[in-house]
């Protein structure tokens, strides 16, 4: 389902804190090689751009602090009704597709699960949508 959302989108927009966004680097490169436009968006108002309807936004936030500290962010992300995917402990966007990472695990395990999700999305897309 995630790959279908990505396939049917004009752009893939990755949003996460600076620490979490580093996990997107390999995914961004892999999808670029597959001919897809992948953009990392900022969580800061001065640099943020509003996703369009035909975009797919992937929001990575383990604890949800990115949303708690930036209450304007969700409204701006959802403004044009793009496809939305969240990755983290909470599915704080009820109308988004959520990939949940269990809370209370060791940080190493959390990172392994996150890496697994990103690899699965990338490899499944390469195998089934190219």
What does each model-identified segment do?
Residues 7-130:
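Glycine-rich phosphate-binding loops that contact phosphosugars or nucleotide phosphates
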């Amino acid at each position: 389902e995630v790959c279908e959302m990505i396939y049917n989108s004009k752009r893939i927009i990755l949003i996460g804190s600076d620490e979490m966004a580093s996990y997107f680097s390999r995914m961004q490169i892999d999808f670029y090689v597959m001919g897809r436009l992948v953009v990392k968006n900022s969580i800061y108002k001065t640099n943020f751009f509003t996703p369009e309807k035909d975009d797919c936004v992937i929001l990575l936030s383990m604890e949800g602090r990115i949303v708690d500290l930036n209450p304007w962010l969700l409204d701006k992300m959802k403004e044009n009704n793009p496809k939305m995917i969240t990755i983290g402990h909470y599915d704080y966007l009820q109308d988004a597709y959520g990939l949940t990472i269990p809370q209370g695990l060791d940080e190493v395990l959390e990172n392994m699960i996150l890496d697994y999700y990103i690899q699965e999305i990338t490899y499944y897309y390469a195998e089934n949508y190219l």
